[in-house]
Regions:
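Peripheral terminal appendages
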Residues: 1-36, 42, 46-50, 54, ...
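Catalytic subdomain that performs nucleotidyl-dependent activation
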Residues: 81, 118-122, 126, 139-214
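Residue-level marker of structural boundaries
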Residues: 56, 104-105, 160, 185, ...
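Short hydrophobic/aromatic-enriched beta-strand-loop microsegments
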Residues: 58-60, 164, 242
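Predominant activation on well-ordered alpha-helical scaffold segments within soluble catalytic domains
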Residues: 23, 48, 52, 77, ...
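ATP-dependent adenylation/nucleotidyltransferase module used to activate substrates
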Residues: 1-152, 231
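Generic alpha-helical structural context detector
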Residues: 97, 156, 178-181, 220, ...
């Protein structure tokens, strides 16, 4: 976990462990197979390909027309067709419009948080579709979140975080890129700028305010129990940026936990 540089032997072991995990999870749920939201990005492509190796997988491609880049739709469909993964493409515009209308009926303005509120609605709409397919066809929902995103809370609670299992949730983003190359995924998937596609022109690194390479280095050191001062000194990264990452990790812990239960019995 503490090394960001993996050998081919490491990657082979990781692939086996993840595919075994997927297989066992499907069997434990007495499910027919799995479903995964395929965005055209590296995380979902890696998960889809690993799952397809060992299970009956259906991919859902869920663009918002006018927001999701056509390139992403093309990449997602190309990955599915190239590797023979059955898929369904569903435009989510009407669903989002309905949910936004409901928000209006509740007389909620959103204020300065409007962009984030709408983005969360989109992520939760996709979650609803994932589970509609999963429930109808007796599948489990595969999440595509990686360790980097999970640690800093870069996902929507009960949105893209609403899944049954997280096959790559133990891998930092840096690891995911290495695994993608090991699996021989196309360069156009590996080299594209990561984006959640929640608004026009959105990119992960711009929203996070830090490059994934630096973010992963900080997270690895935090996982080792290093202090902010030690990390700042050893990595040569601005202290304010290290503190920002540290605070995000603390503030997003609730996203990784089940809701607290009030204890009423002695």
């Amino acid at each position: 976990m503490y090394s960001l540089s993996l050998t081919d032997e490491d990657l082979g072991t990781i692939k086996r462990k993840i595919t075994d995990f997927i297989t066992n999870s499907i069997e434990d749920a007495a499910a027919k197979g799995a479903t995964v939201a395929l965005s055209g990005g590296v995380d979902s492509s890696v998960v889809a390909l690993l799952a397809h190796d060992v299970a009956d997988v259906k991919a859902l491609i869920l663009p918002e027309l006018g927001v999701t880049p056509q390139e992403d739709i093309f990449h997602a469909t190309t990955i599915a067709e190239t590797y023979g993964i059955p898929y369904k493409l569903v435009k989510i515009n009407d669903i989002i419009n309905c949910l936004n209308t409901a928000k209006g009926l509740l007389e909620l303005s959103g204020g300065e948080n409007q962009k984030v509120i709408v983005a969360n609605i989109k992520a939760r709409a996709r979650m609803i579709l994932n589970y509609t397919v999963a429930n109808t066809e007796n599948r489990i929902v595969l999440g595509t979140g990686n360790r980097t995103e999970l640690r800093v809370g870069y996902f929507t609670k009960y949105g893209d975080g609403g899944v049954d299992i997280l096959p790559i949730g133990n891998l930092y983003k840096t690891h995911v890129y290495q695994l993608a190359a090991y699996l021989a995924l196309p360069d156009y998937i590996i080299r594209k700028a990561p984006s959640a596609g929640l608004w026009v022109g959105q990119t992960d690194e711009e929203e996070l305010g830090i490059r994934y390479t630096d973010l992963d280095k900080i997270l690895v050191e935090l996982d080792k129990g290093r202090s902010v001062d030690q990390i700042t000194r050893d990595l040569g990264i601005n202290k304010s940026k290290v503190i920002e990452v540290y605070n995000r990790v603390l503030q997003s812990k609730h996203k990784l936990e089940m809701p607290p239960i009030a204890q009423v019995w002695d």
